[in-house]
Amino acid sequence: MSVRSLPAALRACARLQPNDPAFTFMNYEQNWDGAAETLTWSQLYRRTLNVARELSSCGSVGDRAVILAPQGLEYVVAFLGALQAGRIAVPLSVPQGGASDERATSVLRDASPVAILTTSPVIDDVTQHVSAQSAGPAPSIIELDRLDLDAAAGSGAGTENYPATAYLQYTSGSTREPAGVMLSHQNLVTNFEQLMSGYFADTDGIAPPDSTLVSWLPFYHDMGLVLGVCAPILGGYQAVLTSPVSFLQRPARWLQMLATSSHAFSAAPNFAFELAAKKVSDDDMAGLDLGNVLTILSGSERVQPATLKRFADRFARFNLQEKVLRPSYGLAEATVYVSTSRPGQPPELVEFDAESLSTGQAKQCESGAGTQLVSYVLPRSPIVRVVDPDTCTECPDGTVGEIWVCGDNVAIGYWNKPEESERTFGGKLASPSEGTPEGPWLRTGDSGFITDGKMFIIGRIKDLLIVYGRNHSPDDIEATIQEITRSRCAAISVPGDRSTEKLVAIIEYRRRGDSDQEAMDMLVAVKREVTSALSNSHGLSVADLVLVAPGSIPTTTSGKVRRAACVEQYRQQQFARLDV
Protein backbone atom coordinates (compact mmCIF):
# COMPACT_ATOMS: atom_id res chain seq x y z
CA MET A 1 0.00 0.00 0.00
CA SER A 2 1.56 3.28 -1.14
CA VAL A 3 0.43 6.09 1.18
CA ARG A 4 1.89 9.29 2.58
CA SER A 5 0.45 9.22 6.09
CA LEU A 6 -1.03 6.92 8.72
CA PRO A 7 -4.53 8.49 8.45
CA ALA A 8 -4.46 7.93 4.68
CA ALA A 9 -3.49 4.28 5.21
CA LEU A 10 -6.33 3.80 7.70
CA ARG A 11 -8.81 5.35 5.28
CA ALA A 12 -7.60 2.99 2.53
CA CYS A 13 -7.95 -0.07 4.78
CA ALA A 14 -11.48 0.98 5.76
CA ARG A 15 -12.39 1.32 2.08
CA LEU A 16 -10.69 -1.85 0.79
CA GLN A 17 -11.45 -4.30 3.62
CA PRO A 18 -14.14 -2.66 5.78
CA ASN A 19 -15.40 -5.81 7.50
CA ASP A 20 -12.07 -7.54 8.06
CA PRO A 21 -10.76 -7.62 11.65
CA ALA A 22 -8.21 -4.86 12.21
CA PHE A 23 -7.27 -4.88 15.90
CA THR A 24 -8.04 -7.55 18.49
CA PHE A 25 -7.17 -6.84 22.12
CA MET A 26 -6.95 -9.78 24.51
CA ASN A 27 -8.22 -8.52 27.86
CA TYR A 28 -6.83 -10.73 30.62
CA GLU A 29 -7.97 -8.40 33.41
CA GLN A 30 -11.58 -9.07 32.48
CA ASN A 31 -11.01 -12.80 32.05
CA TRP A 32 -7.96 -14.82 33.17
CA ASP A 33 -8.17 -16.85 29.95
CA GLY A 34 -8.57 -13.71 27.85
CA ALA A 35 -11.61 -11.88 26.50
CA ALA A 36 -11.15 -10.87 22.86
CA GLU A 37 -12.28 -7.37 21.86
CA THR A 38 -12.15 -6.76 18.10
CA LEU A 39 -12.60 -3.74 15.82
CA THR A 40 -13.02 -4.07 12.06
CA TRP A 41 -11.33 -1.56 9.78
CA SER A 42 -14.56 0.38 9.24
CA GLN A 43 -15.27 0.48 13.00
CA LEU A 44 -11.74 1.65 13.72
CA TYR A 45 -11.98 4.39 11.09
CA ARG A 46 -15.38 5.57 12.37
CA ARG A 47 -14.10 5.78 15.96
CA THR A 48 -10.99 7.61 14.79
CA LEU A 49 -13.12 10.22 12.99
CA ASN A 50 -15.30 10.72 16.07
CA VAL A 51 -12.28 11.28 18.31
CA ALA A 52 -10.92 13.73 15.73
CA ARG A 53 -14.22 15.62 15.77
CA GLU A 54 -14.08 15.84 19.57
CA LEU A 55 -10.52 17.18 19.36
CA SER A 56 -11.43 19.76 16.72
CA SER A 57 -12.69 22.07 19.47
CA CYS A 58 -9.40 21.75 21.39
CA GLY A 59 -6.75 24.12 20.08
CA SER A 60 -5.69 24.04 16.46
CA VAL A 61 -3.52 22.10 14.01
CA GLY A 62 -0.09 21.44 15.52
CA ASP A 63 -1.22 21.61 19.15
CA ARG A 64 -0.45 18.59 21.31
CA ALA A 65 -2.85 15.87 22.48
CA VAL A 66 -1.47 13.58 25.19
CA ILE A 67 -2.74 10.01 25.52
CA LEU A 68 -2.87 8.91 29.16
CA ALA A 69 -4.88 5.70 29.00
CA PRO A 70 -4.48 2.03 29.86
CA GLN A 71 -3.28 -0.36 27.16
CA GLY A 72 -6.30 -1.24 25.03
CA LEU A 73 -8.28 -0.38 21.91
CA GLU A 74 -9.16 3.05 23.34
CA TYR A 75 -5.45 3.89 23.32
CA VAL A 76 -5.17 2.94 19.65
CA VAL A 77 -8.22 5.02 18.74
CA ALA A 78 -6.93 7.99 20.78
CA PHE A 79 -3.58 8.00 18.98
CA LEU A 80 -5.18 7.72 15.54
CA GLY A 81 -7.82 10.33 16.38
CA ALA A 82 -5.16 12.83 17.39
CA LEU A 83 -3.33 12.32 14.08
CA GLN A 84 -6.60 12.57 12.14
CA ALA A 85 -7.38 15.89 13.85
CA GLY A 86 -3.98 17.32 12.95
CA ARG A 87 -2.93 17.41 16.59
CA ILE A 88 0.53 16.19 17.54
CA ALA A 89 -0.05 12.93 19.41
CA VAL A 90 1.97 12.32 22.57
CA PRO A 91 1.72 8.70 23.78
CA LEU A 92 2.35 8.28 27.52
CA SER A 93 1.72 5.79 30.30
CA VAL A 94 -0.87 6.47 33.00
CA PRO A 95 0.88 8.16 35.98
CA GLN A 96 1.06 5.79 38.93
CA GLY A 97 3.45 7.47 41.32
CA GLY A 98 7.23 7.37 41.62
CA ALA A 99 9.27 7.50 38.41
CA SER A 100 6.16 7.37 36.21
CA ASP A 101 4.87 10.53 37.87
CA GLU A 102 8.18 12.31 37.32
CA ARG A 103 8.16 11.29 33.68
CA ALA A 104 4.55 12.37 33.12
CA THR A 105 5.20 15.67 34.88
CA SER A 106 8.24 16.35 32.71
CA VAL A 107 6.39 15.50 29.48
CA LEU A 108 3.27 17.51 30.33
CA ARG A 109 5.44 20.52 31.13
CA ASP A 110 7.42 20.14 27.90
CA ALA A 111 4.54 19.35 25.53
CA SER A 112 1.94 21.84 26.90
CA PRO A 113 -1.02 19.83 25.56
CA VAL A 114 -4.43 21.29 24.72
CA ALA A 115 -6.11 17.94 25.38
CA ILE A 116 -5.67 14.77 27.42
CA LEU A 117 -7.23 11.59 26.03
CA THR A 118 -8.01 9.05 28.74
CA THR A 119 -10.66 6.61 30.02
CA SER A 120 -13.00 6.63 33.02
CA PRO A 121 -11.23 3.87 35.04
CA VAL A 122 -8.13 6.08 35.41
CA ILE A 123 -9.74 9.53 35.19
CA ASP A 124 -9.17 10.35 38.88
CA ASP A 125 -5.42 9.64 38.74
CA VAL A 126 -5.07 11.51 35.46
CA THR A 127 -7.09 14.54 36.58
CA GLN A 128 -5.18 14.76 39.85
CA HIS A 129 -1.85 14.64 38.05
CA VAL A 130 -2.81 17.09 35.31
CA SER A 131 -4.30 19.53 37.83
CA ALA A 132 -1.00 19.60 39.72
CA GLN A 133 0.71 21.10 36.66
CA SER A 134 -0.11 24.77 37.12
CA ALA A 135 1.84 26.25 34.19
CA GLY A 136 -0.30 27.51 31.28
CA PRO A 137 -4.00 26.97 30.54
CA ALA A 138 -5.50 23.66 31.67
CA PRO A 139 -5.95 21.09 28.88
CA SER A 140 -9.34 19.59 28.09
CA ILE A 141 -9.70 16.09 29.51
CA ILE A 142 -11.63 13.73 27.24
CA GLU A 143 -12.93 10.37 28.51
CA LEU A 144 -13.04 8.21 25.41
CA ASP A 145 -15.35 5.55 26.82
CA ARG A 146 -18.00 8.17 27.58
CA LEU A 147 -18.20 9.25 23.93
CA ASP A 148 -20.45 7.62 21.35
CA LEU A 149 -17.54 6.54 19.19
CA ASP A 150 -19.71 4.34 16.98
CA ALA A 151 -22.02 7.18 15.93
CA ALA A 152 -22.17 7.99 12.23
CA ALA A 153 -19.04 10.05 11.61
CA GLY A 154 -20.38 12.16 8.76
CA SER A 155 -18.01 14.59 7.10
CA GLY A 156 -15.63 17.24 8.34
CA ALA A 157 -13.94 15.14 11.00
CA GLY A 158 -10.19 15.68 10.90
CA THR A 159 -7.96 17.50 8.47
CA GLU A 160 -5.69 16.90 5.52
CA ASN A 161 -3.53 19.79 6.72
CA TYR A 162 -1.22 17.71 8.87
CA PRO A 163 1.54 19.41 10.88
CA ALA A 164 5.19 18.68 10.09
CA THR A 165 5.37 16.64 13.30
CA ALA A 166 2.90 13.76 13.55
CA TYR A 167 3.76 12.64 17.08
CA LEU A 168 6.29 13.08 19.86
CA GLN A 169 8.03 9.91 21.02
CA TYR A 170 9.50 10.71 24.40
CA THR A 171 12.73 8.88 25.15
CA SER A 172 12.97 6.77 28.28
CA GLY A 173 15.32 9.15 30.04
CA SER A 174 17.78 6.56 31.37
CA THR A 175 20.59 9.12 31.27
CA ARG A 176 18.68 12.42 31.19
CA GLU A 177 15.26 14.04 31.35
CA PRO A 178 12.95 12.62 28.64
CA ALA A 179 13.17 14.42 25.29
CA GLY A 180 10.37 14.43 22.73
CA VAL A 181 11.56 13.04 19.39
CA MET A 182 9.63 14.87 16.64
CA LEU A 183 8.50 12.28 14.10
CA SER A 184 6.73 13.02 10.83
CA HIS A 185 4.39 10.94 8.70
CA GLN A 186 7.24 10.62 6.18
CA ASN A 187 9.55 9.28 8.90
CA LEU A 188 6.99 6.65 9.82
CA VAL A 189 6.10 5.55 6.28
CA THR A 190 9.78 5.44 5.26
CA ASN A 191 10.80 3.41 8.30
CA PHE A 192 7.97 0.95 7.74
CA GLU A 193 9.24 0.36 4.20
CA GLN A 194 12.80 -0.02 5.52
CA LEU A 195 11.88 -2.54 8.20
CA MET A 196 9.78 -4.56 5.78
CA SER A 197 12.75 -4.66 3.39
CA GLY A 198 14.95 -5.84 6.26
CA TYR A 199 12.71 -8.51 7.74
CA PHE A 200 11.41 -9.76 4.40
CA ALA A 201 14.52 -9.26 2.26
CA ASP A 202 14.09 -12.66 0.64
CA THR A 203 10.53 -11.82 -0.54
CA ASP A 204 11.17 -8.27 -1.81
CA GLY A 205 9.93 -6.67 1.40
CA ILE A 206 6.49 -8.29 1.22
CA ALA A 207 4.95 -10.34 4.03
CA PRO A 208 2.20 -12.94 3.50
CA PRO A 209 -1.20 -11.20 3.23
CA ASP A 210 -2.56 -13.17 6.21
CA SER A 211 0.28 -12.04 8.49
CA THR A 212 -0.64 -11.05 12.05
CA LEU A 213 1.18 -8.49 14.19
CA VAL A 214 1.30 -9.91 17.73
CA SER A 215 2.37 -7.60 20.55
CA TRP A 216 2.16 -7.01 24.28
CA LEU A 217 4.65 -4.12 24.19
CA PRO A 218 3.48 -0.80 25.69
CA PHE A 219 2.06 1.64 23.14
CA TYR A 220 3.94 4.54 24.74
CA HIS A 221 7.33 3.12 23.67
CA ASP A 222 8.62 3.26 20.11
CA MET A 223 8.73 -0.48 19.41
CA GLY A 224 5.27 -1.06 20.87
CA LEU A 225 3.76 1.91 19.05
CA VAL A 226 5.18 1.11 15.62
CA LEU A 227 4.70 -2.66 15.82
CA GLY A 228 1.38 -2.67 17.67
CA VAL A 229 -0.39 0.33 16.14
CA CYS A 230 1.30 1.77 13.05
CA ALA A 231 2.65 -1.26 11.15
CA PRO A 232 -0.70 -3.11 11.01
CA ILE A 233 -2.32 -0.05 9.42
CA LEU A 234 0.53 0.72 7.00
CA GLY A 235 0.58 -2.91 5.85
CA GLY A 236 -3.12 -3.65 6.11
CA TYR A 237 -2.46 -6.54 8.52
CA GLN A 238 -4.47 -7.71 11.50
CA ALA A 239 -3.03 -7.03 14.96
CA VAL A 240 -3.57 -9.18 18.05
CA LEU A 241 -2.55 -7.26 21.14
CA THR A 242 -2.49 -7.44 24.91
CA SER A 243 -0.84 -5.52 27.75
CA PRO A 244 2.64 -5.76 29.29
CA VAL A 245 1.04 -6.67 32.63
CA SER A 246 -0.78 -9.59 31.02
CA PHE A 247 2.53 -10.88 29.65
CA LEU A 248 4.37 -10.45 32.95
CA GLN A 249 1.57 -12.17 34.88
CA ARG A 250 1.76 -15.17 32.58
CA PRO A 251 4.45 -15.20 29.84
CA ALA A 252 2.76 -18.23 28.24
CA ARG A 253 0.09 -15.89 26.88
CA TRP A 254 2.57 -14.42 24.42
CA LEU A 255 3.59 -17.85 23.11
CA GLN A 256 -0.04 -18.93 22.90
CA MET A 257 -0.91 -15.82 20.88
CA LEU A 258 2.00 -16.54 18.54
CA ALA A 259 0.86 -20.13 18.04
CA THR A 260 -2.80 -19.29 17.39
CA SER A 261 -2.20 -16.35 15.00
CA SER A 262 -1.54 -16.86 11.30
CA HIS A 263 2.02 -15.99 10.23
CA ALA A 264 2.78 -14.16 13.47
CA PHE A 265 5.24 -11.26 13.46
CA SER A 266 6.23 -10.12 16.94
CA ALA A 267 8.90 -8.37 18.98
CA ALA A 268 10.24 -8.26 22.52
CA PRO A 269 13.22 -7.04 24.53
CA ASN A 270 15.82 -9.52 25.72
CA PHE A 271 14.37 -9.99 29.19
CA ALA A 272 11.09 -11.30 27.72
CA PHE A 273 12.87 -14.15 25.92
CA GLU A 274 14.61 -15.05 29.18
CA LEU A 275 11.36 -14.92 31.13
CA ALA A 276 9.45 -17.01 28.59
CA ALA A 277 12.16 -19.67 28.41
CA LYS A 278 12.13 -19.94 32.19
CA LYS A 279 8.41 -19.67 33.01
CA VAL A 280 6.45 -21.26 30.14
CA SER A 281 5.72 -24.93 30.83
CA ASP A 282 5.00 -27.81 28.47
CA ASP A 283 1.44 -27.86 29.83
CA ASP A 284 1.07 -24.20 28.78
CA MET A 285 2.00 -25.22 25.23
CA ALA A 286 -0.03 -28.43 25.03
CA GLY A 287 -1.41 -28.91 21.53
CA LEU A 288 0.22 -25.72 20.20
CA ASP A 289 2.57 -25.37 17.23
CA LEU A 290 4.98 -22.47 16.60
CA GLY A 291 6.00 -23.66 13.15
CA ASN A 292 3.94 -20.94 11.44
CA VAL A 293 5.66 -18.01 13.20
CA LEU A 294 7.25 -15.63 10.69
CA THR A 295 9.46 -13.41 12.82
CA ILE A 296 10.19 -12.61 16.45
CA LEU A 297 12.55 -9.68 16.60
CA SER A 298 14.67 -8.97 19.65
CA GLY A 299 15.27 -5.28 20.24
CA SER A 300 14.92 -2.27 22.55
CA GLU A 301 17.75 -3.51 24.79
CA ARG A 302 21.06 -5.30 24.29
CA VAL A 303 20.56 -8.67 22.57
CA GLN A 304 22.15 -11.45 24.63
CA PRO A 305 23.07 -14.40 22.35
CA ALA A 306 22.83 -16.91 25.20
CA THR A 307 19.27 -15.82 25.94
CA LEU A 308 18.15 -16.27 22.33
CA LYS A 309 19.76 -19.71 22.30
CA ARG A 310 17.91 -20.74 25.46
CA PHE A 311 14.63 -19.48 23.97
CA ALA A 312 15.19 -21.32 20.68
CA ASP A 313 16.14 -24.56 22.45
CA ARG A 314 13.20 -24.33 24.86
CA PHE A 315 10.56 -24.02 22.13
CA ALA A 316 12.19 -26.14 19.41
CA ARG A 317 9.98 -29.07 20.49
CA PHE A 318 6.98 -26.91 19.52
CA ASN A 319 8.47 -26.42 16.04
CA LEU A 320 9.86 -22.93 16.60
CA GLN A 321 12.55 -22.38 13.97
CA GLU A 322 15.67 -20.58 15.19
CA LYS A 323 15.83 -18.60 11.94
CA VAL A 324 12.68 -16.62 12.88
CA LEU A 325 14.58 -14.98 15.77
CA ARG A 326 15.86 -11.67 14.41
CA PRO A 327 18.16 -9.51 16.57
CA SER A 328 17.44 -5.90 15.65
CA TYR A 329 19.00 -2.49 16.18
CA GLY A 330 17.17 0.81 16.24
CA LEU A 331 16.27 3.88 18.26
CA ALA A 332 13.43 6.39 18.57
CA GLU A 333 15.50 9.09 16.85
CA ALA A 334 15.43 6.90 13.70
CA THR A 335 11.67 6.25 14.22
CA VAL A 336 12.40 2.74 15.51
CA TYR A 337 14.33 0.55 13.05
CA VAL A 338 17.85 0.69 11.62
CA SER A 339 18.95 -2.88 10.91
CA THR A 340 18.38 -6.55 11.63
CA SER A 341 20.14 -9.88 11.12
CA ARG A 342 20.24 -11.76 7.83
CA PRO A 343 16.96 -13.45 6.85
CA GLY A 344 16.49 -17.17 6.47
CA GLN A 345 19.13 -18.31 8.97
CA PRO A 346 19.74 -18.30 12.74
CA PRO A 347 21.37 -15.19 14.26
CA GLU A 348 25.09 -15.08 13.43
CA LEU A 349 27.33 -14.77 16.48
CA VAL A 350 30.98 -13.72 16.16
CA GLU A 351 33.59 -13.65 18.93
CA PHE A 352 36.08 -10.81 19.27
CA ASP A 353 39.11 -10.48 21.50
CA ALA A 354 38.01 -8.54 24.59
CA GLU A 355 41.43 -6.93 25.10
CA SER A 356 41.48 -5.59 21.53
CA LEU A 357 37.91 -4.30 21.79
CA SER A 358 38.84 -2.36 24.93
CA THR A 359 41.45 -0.49 22.85
CA GLY A 360 39.03 0.21 19.99
CA GLN A 361 40.02 -2.57 17.59
CA ALA A 362 37.91 -5.56 16.56
CA LYS A 363 39.87 -8.79 16.16
CA GLN A 364 38.09 -12.10 15.79
CA CYS A 365 39.18 -14.91 18.09
CA GLU A 366 38.45 -18.56 18.71
CA SER A 367 35.07 -19.59 20.04
CA GLY A 368 34.79 -19.31 23.80
CA ALA A 369 37.82 -17.05 24.13
CA GLY A 370 36.32 -13.58 23.73
CA THR A 371 33.29 -11.31 23.62
CA GLN A 372 30.39 -12.68 21.59
CA LEU A 373 28.54 -10.12 19.43
CA VAL A 374 25.56 -10.41 17.10
CA SER A 375 26.09 -9.45 13.46
CA TYR A 376 23.65 -7.11 11.70
CA VAL A 377 23.16 -6.42 8.02
CA LEU A 378 24.77 -3.16 6.91
CA PRO A 379 21.64 -1.66 5.34
CA ARG A 380 21.39 0.36 2.14
CA SER A 381 18.50 2.34 3.59
CA PRO A 382 18.97 3.97 5.97
CA ILE A 383 22.66 4.66 5.35
CA VAL A 384 24.86 3.66 8.28
CA ARG A 385 28.49 4.58 8.91
CA VAL A 386 30.86 4.17 11.85
CA VAL A 387 32.49 7.50 12.63
CA ASP A 388 35.24 8.82 14.89
CA PRO A 389 33.12 11.21 17.01
CA ASP A 390 36.06 13.54 17.63
CA THR A 391 37.30 14.00 14.05
CA CYS A 392 33.95 13.27 12.28
CA THR A 393 35.77 11.00 9.82
CA GLU A 394 34.69 7.51 8.84
CA CYS A 395 36.42 4.72 10.74
CA PRO A 396 38.30 2.01 8.84
CA ASP A 397 36.92 -1.53 8.91
CA GLY A 398 37.40 -3.14 12.31
CA THR A 399 37.81 0.15 14.19
CA VAL A 400 35.33 1.01 16.93
CA GLY A 401 33.51 4.32 16.59
CA GLU A 402 30.07 5.90 16.86
CA ILE A 403 27.16 4.61 14.76
CA TRP A 404 25.80 7.40 12.51
CA VAL A 405 22.54 7.09 10.54
CA CYS A 406 21.23 9.07 7.56
CA GLY A 407 17.85 8.71 5.85
CA ASP A 408 14.25 9.88 5.63
CA ASN A 409 13.44 7.83 8.72
CA VAL A 410 15.62 10.11 10.89
CA ALA A 411 13.51 12.42 13.03
CA ILE A 412 13.26 16.19 12.73
CA GLY A 413 14.84 16.78 16.14
CA TYR A 414 13.87 17.10 19.81
CA TRP A 415 10.84 19.15 20.81
CA ASN A 416 11.83 22.50 22.36
CA LYS A 417 15.52 21.52 22.43
CA PRO A 418 17.27 23.24 19.48
CA GLU A 419 20.82 22.93 20.82
CA GLU A 420 20.49 19.26 21.71
CA SER A 421 18.79 18.67 18.35
CA GLU A 422 21.72 20.21 16.50
CA ARG A 423 24.24 18.12 18.45
CA THR A 424 22.33 14.88 17.84
CA PHE A 425 20.76 15.33 14.40
CA GLY A 426 23.20 17.73 12.74
CA GLY A 427 26.26 15.53 12.28
CA LYS A 428 28.49 16.34 9.30
CA LEU A 429 31.20 14.09 7.93
CA ALA A 430 34.65 15.43 7.15
CA SER A 431 35.82 14.14 3.75
CA PRO A 432 33.05 11.56 3.26
CA SER A 433 33.81 8.53 1.11
CA GLU A 434 32.36 8.25 -2.38
CA GLY A 435 28.59 7.81 -2.30
CA THR A 436 28.37 8.90 1.33
CA PRO A 437 26.48 12.14 2.06
CA GLU A 438 28.16 14.88 4.07
CA GLY A 439 25.08 15.28 6.25
CA PRO A 440 22.97 15.76 8.17
CA TRP A 441 23.63 12.61 10.18
CA LEU A 442 22.02 11.25 13.33
CA ARG A 443 24.70 10.68 15.94
CA THR A 444 23.22 7.70 17.76
CA GLY A 445 25.48 7.72 20.81
CA ASP A 446 26.05 3.99 20.27
CA SER A 447 29.47 2.46 19.75
CA GLY A 448 30.12 -0.24 17.20
CA PHE A 449 32.15 -1.23 14.17
CA ILE A 450 31.86 -2.61 10.66
CA THR A 451 33.89 -5.57 9.44
CA ASP A 452 33.45 -7.86 6.43
CA GLY A 453 30.39 -5.86 5.41
CA LYS A 454 28.60 -6.58 8.70
CA MET A 455 27.72 -4.25 11.54
CA PHE A 456 28.29 -4.96 15.23
CA ILE A 457 26.89 -2.97 18.16
CA ILE A 458 28.82 -2.67 21.43
CA GLY A 459 26.66 -0.33 23.53
CA ARG A 460 26.00 3.23 24.63
CA ILE A 461 29.10 5.42 24.54
CA LYS A 462 27.95 7.29 27.66
CA ASP A 463 27.71 3.99 29.53
CA LEU A 464 31.22 2.74 28.68
CA LEU A 465 33.20 1.92 31.79
CA ILE A 466 36.77 3.16 31.87
CA VAL A 467 38.71 0.93 34.25
CA TYR A 468 42.49 1.36 34.42
CA GLY A 469 42.43 3.31 31.17
CA ARG A 470 40.57 0.65 29.17
CA ASN A 471 37.04 0.86 27.77
CA HIS A 472 34.64 -1.87 28.81
CA SER A 473 31.01 -2.30 27.78
CA PRO A 474 28.72 -2.61 30.80
CA ASP A 475 26.39 -4.74 28.66
CA ASP A 476 29.14 -7.35 28.19
CA ILE A 477 29.96 -7.39 31.89
CA GLU A 478 26.28 -7.64 32.82
CA ALA A 479 25.79 -10.50 30.34
CA THR A 480 28.58 -12.45 32.05
CA ILE A 481 27.00 -11.87 35.46
CA GLN A 482 23.51 -12.78 34.26
CA GLU A 483 24.72 -16.13 32.94
CA ILE A 484 25.42 -16.96 36.59
CA THR A 485 22.63 -15.16 38.46
CA ARG A 486 19.85 -15.01 35.80
CA SER A 487 18.75 -11.73 37.37
CA ARG A 488 18.93 -7.99 36.73
CA CYS A 489 22.29 -6.39 37.42
CA ALA A 490 24.15 -3.15 36.81
CA ALA A 491 27.85 -2.73 36.06
CA ILE A 492 29.08 0.73 37.02
CA SER A 493 32.37 2.50 37.60
CA VAL A 494 32.95 4.80 40.55
CA PRO A 495 35.96 6.93 41.52
CA GLY A 496 38.69 5.00 43.30
CA ASP A 497 42.04 5.95 44.75
CA ARG A 498 44.62 8.00 42.80
CA SER A 499 42.10 9.32 40.24
CA THR A 500 41.29 5.83 38.93
CA GLU A 501 37.89 4.27 38.34
CA LYS A 502 36.89 1.01 39.98
CA LEU A 503 34.32 -1.55 38.85
CA VAL A 504 31.25 -2.13 40.99
CA ALA A 505 28.46 -4.60 40.20
CA ILE A 506 24.97 -4.31 41.69
CA ILE A 507 23.15 -7.65 41.47
CA GLU A 508 19.53 -8.43 42.30
CA TYR A 509 19.51 -11.71 44.20
CA ARG A 510 16.71 -13.80 45.66
CA ARG A 511 17.88 -15.32 48.94
CA ARG A 512 17.82 -19.10 49.07
CA GLY A 513 18.59 -21.65 51.75
CA ASP A 514 16.83 -23.31 54.70
CA SER A 515 18.81 -21.41 57.33
CA ASP A 516 20.52 -18.04 57.63
CA GLN A 517 23.91 -19.73 57.47
CA GLU A 518 23.00 -21.73 54.36
CA ALA A 519 21.61 -18.59 52.70
CA MET A 520 24.82 -16.69 53.45
CA ASP A 521 26.98 -19.57 52.17
CA MET A 522 25.06 -19.59 48.87
CA LEU A 523 25.39 -15.82 48.61
CA VAL A 524 29.16 -16.01 49.14
CA ALA A 525 29.38 -18.75 46.50
CA VAL A 526 27.58 -16.55 43.96
CA LYS A 527 29.96 -13.66 44.67
CA ARG A 528 32.95 -15.97 44.26
CA GLU A 529 31.63 -17.32 40.94
CA VAL A 530 30.91 -13.83 39.57
CA THR A 531 34.33 -12.55 40.62
CA SER A 532 36.04 -15.46 38.88
CA ALA A 533 33.97 -15.09 35.69
CA LEU A 534 34.71 -11.37 35.38
CA SER A 535 38.41 -12.04 35.82
CA ASN A 536 38.50 -14.89 33.30
CA SER A 537 36.23 -13.35 30.63
CA HIS A 538 37.14 -9.68 30.86
CA GLY A 539 40.45 -9.52 32.74
CA LEU A 540 38.70 -7.35 35.32
CA SER A 541 38.92 -7.30 39.06
CA VAL A 542 35.68 -6.15 40.67
CA ALA A 543 36.11 -3.74 43.57
CA ASP A 544 32.69 -4.39 45.10
CA LEU A 545 29.84 -6.82 44.49
CA VAL A 546 26.60 -5.52 45.96
CA LEU A 547 23.79 -8.05 46.29
CA VAL A 548 20.34 -6.53 46.73
CA ALA A 549 16.74 -7.72 46.78
CA PRO A 550 14.78 -8.04 43.49
CA GLY A 551 13.36 -4.70 42.37
CA SER A 552 16.12 -2.64 44.03
CA ILE A 553 17.93 -1.52 40.87
CA PRO A 554 16.42 1.70 39.43
CA THR A 555 15.07 1.32 35.89
CA THR A 556 13.26 3.36 33.26
CA THR A 557 9.62 2.73 32.31
CA SER A 558 10.88 0.37 29.59
CA GLY A 559 12.92 -1.68 32.05
CA LYS A 560 16.38 -0.36 31.14
CA VAL A 561 18.82 0.00 34.02
CA ARG A 562 19.42 3.62 35.06
CA ARG A 563 23.17 3.30 35.58
CA ALA A 564 23.70 6.95 36.54
CA ALA A 565 21.10 6.54 39.30
CA CYS A 566 22.88 3.35 40.41
CA VAL A 567 26.14 5.25 40.73
CA GLU A 568 24.48 7.93 42.85
CA GLN A 569 22.71 5.40 45.08
CA TYR A 570 25.96 3.48 45.56
CA ARG A 571 27.92 6.61 46.45
CA GLN A 572 25.21 7.61 48.93
CA GLN A 573 25.17 4.04 50.36
CA GLN A 574 21.44 3.79 49.65
CA PHE A 575 21.36 0.16 48.50
CA ALA A 576 20.07 -2.25 51.17
CA ARG A 577 22.77 -4.91 50.90
CA LEU A 578 22.02 -8.58 51.47
CA ASP A 579 25.70 -9.45 51.86
CA VAL A 580 26.42 -7.58 55.10
Swiss-Prot record:
GO cellular component: plasma membrane
InterPro entries in UniProt: AMP-bd_C, AMP-bd_C_sf, AMP-dep_synth/lig_dom, ANL_N_sf, FAAL/FAAC, LCFA-AMP_ligase_FadD28
Molecular function GO terms recorded: adenylyltransferase activity; ATP binding; ligase activity
Gene3D superfamilies the UniProt entry points to: 3.30.300.30, N-terminal domain of ligase-like
EC id: 6.2.1.49
A Pfam family reported for this protein in Swiss-Prot or TrEMBL: AMP-binding
Keywords assigned: ATP-binding, Fatty acid metabolism, Ligase, Lipid metabolism, Nucleotide-binding
GO annotation, biological process: Actinobacterium-type cell wall biogenesis; fatty acid biosynthetic process
The reaction(s) this protein catalyses: holo-[mycocerosate synthase] + a long-chain fatty acid + ATP = a long-chain fatty acyl-[mycocerosate synthase] + AMP + diphosphate; a long-chain fatty acid + ATP + H(+) = a long-chain fatty acyl-AMP + diphosphate; holo-[mycocerosate synthase] + a long-chain fatty acyl-AMP = a long-chain fatty acyl-[mycocerosate synthase] + AMP + H(+)
Protein name: Long-chain-fatty-acid--AMP ligase FadD28
Gene that specifies this protein: fadD28
